[in-house]
Amino acid sequence: MKSNMFTARQIQKMYDFFSSMPWFWEIDAITCRATENSSYRAQAIKLLELDSTHRVLDVACGTGLNFMLIQKYLKNQGSLIGIDVSAKTLNLARKRIGKNNWKNIELIQTDSASYQTEALFDAALCTFAIEIIPPYRQTIDMMIRVVKPGGRIAIIGFKQSSWGYFKLFNSIFKGFSVVFGGVDMNRDVRGYICANCREIFYNEVYGGFYYILVVQK
């Protein structure tokens, strides 16, 4: 199958452009059931089994829509590192942090595959992004590398639906996702990460167009 290949620079420019219109992300989150109160985010984060002592990495954190749910467990303690390639998107995340007076979050602009750290994480997550990040295998490798043995990694990703009549909308969903997100659904994310980690949970949601995957290192 031909893969939708965007370069890291193209993705960065796309998301900087969208972030110059903050209302875009609000509409996108509501339409795609991906708000900061999303049941999909809540389920994935719950399965990370976090507590207030933990150090967590949010890969491609975007505007910070995972932060509220993560803070439910960290309780403004522990440590949360959010990384993203888009500076303008991170600016929106900083506003969210300031609005909520969170003191335990650090934001870093970086290509996720290139991120390095000496201190390991108790858990990592990447939501609605692993099919967008161009070097996705290297990003998965990075998450595995920086998580402690026994730590968990959660992913919410995009896929073609295999659910009944929802399959009729596959081409529309794929086209929309490419144009407004740079999504490449031809990636075998589950197979790649499960070759190196133990699968804890897998479930398809949103008409079969999303999946929630949690693994343990």
Question: Which sequence ranges carry the predicted segments?
Answer:
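Conserved class I S-adenosyl-L-methionine
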Residues: 2-49, 65-69, 92, 169-176
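C-terminal alpha-helical "lid/dimerization" subdomain adjacent to the S-adenosyl-L-methionine
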Residues: 9, 28, 33-35, 154-206
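Helix-to-beta-strand junctions that scaffold the AdoMet/dcAdoMet cofactor pocket
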Residues: 75, 133-134, 147-148
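A short glycine-rich, Lys/Arg-flanked "PGG" loop and its adjoining helix->strand segment in the class I
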Residues: 137-149
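A short SAM/SAH-binding and catalytic strip from SAM-dependent methyltransferases
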Residues: 123-135
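Class I SAM-dependent methyltransferase SAM/SAH-binding core
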Residues: 57-59, 63-114
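C-terminal lobe and adjacent flexible extensions of AdoMet/dcAdoMet transferase-like proteins
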Residues: 213-217
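A short acidic, Gly/Pro-enriched loop at the edge of an enzyme's catalytic core
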Residues: 113-124
